[in-house]
A protein has these predicted regions:
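Active-site nucleotide-donor binding segment shared across nucleotidyl transfer reactions
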Residues: 45-75, 79-87
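Catalytic cores of NTP-dependent nucleotidyl/adenyl transfer enzymes across multiple folds
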Residues: 5, 18, 38-41, 97-223
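Acidic side chains
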Residues: 34, 74-76, 164
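Short charge-dense sequence patches
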Residues: 6-11, 54-66, 183-194
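Catalytic palm subdomain of template-directed nucleic-acid polymerases
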Residues: 79-104
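Helical scaffold of the NTase/Pol beta-like nucleotidyltransferase catalytic core
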Residues: 1-54, 66
Length: 223
């Protein structure tokens, strides 16, 4: 399969990124990164495990909910613990086993299937790397995706999409929200434009609560 947008001449793609950036008052590199983030989300939610995943975190607040302006490389995902064979209230020992099971699934199955999905979708010349871990029960696990940027790199943004997949968060409540790239939104009638797809995105109230809890944990560590 050939990706229609990537099949365009590089000069045409650069022009598209630049025009969208000028219209939205952001950098062309941010528009390019947004395209790759959108493609990554589409690939993730076309996997067999998709019904057991939700999109969460700060990037979901901007990408899915349009509540904040943020150009991040991070895609935070939560995987349903029941999918990994764990239900109900978990003891400390069970939580450790859950994290180990999640890490094993992400590194041995999810990581490989995602690479195959990229190839299937015609997303070529992309490099994947799985972040090294010190412990077998480390959660979340991180996957780095380095894409072939055609816009000059900025100091703040790198040509990388980073996926964090964790098992500790509950997947509810969530709402099906639109995922589309800025380029597709601005040029909906062009032959390269892809239709938006809805993906399960954690409700913002829960995301804000999780951020507060994380800050509390960090404060407790330094207190």
């Amino acid at each position: 399969m050939t990706n229609k947008f990537l099949a365009l001449p590089q000069s045409t793609r650069v022009l598209a990124f630049t025009q969208v950036a000028e219209k939205r008052g952001i950098t062309p590199f941010a528009v390019e990164k947004d395209w790759w983030v959108s493609q990554t989300l589409k690939a993730v939610f076309e996997l067999d495990v998709a019904e057991h995943l939700v999109f969460k975190g700060g990037t979901s607040l901007s990408k899915a909910w349009n509540l904040i302006e943020r150009f991040s490389e991070d895609i935070d995902l939560a995987i349903e613990r029941e999918f990994l064979g764990f239900e109900g209230n978990l003891t400390k020992n069970k939580k450790t086993k859950l994290r180990k099971a999640s890490g094993q699934y992400i590194s041995e199955v999810f990581y490989l299937e995602l690479q195959e999905k990229f190839k299937e979708k015609g997303l070529e010349n992309v490099t994947f790397s799985l972040a090294e871990t010190q412990d077998s029960d480390q959660d979340p696990r991180i996957i780095n995706i380095f894409y072939p940027n055609i816009i000059e790199v900025t100091e703040y943004l790198k040509p990388r999409v980073q996926i964090e997949v964790g098992c500790r968060s509950l997947i509810e409540p969530f709402t099906m929200k639109k995922n589309s790239a800025m380029v597709d939104d601005e040029y909906p009638e062009q032959s390269f434009s892809e239709k938006s797809e809805e993906i399960p995105s954690v409700n913002p109230e829960r995301t804000f609560l999780e951020k507060i809890f994380l800050l509390h944990e960090e404060f407790q560590k330094t207190a």
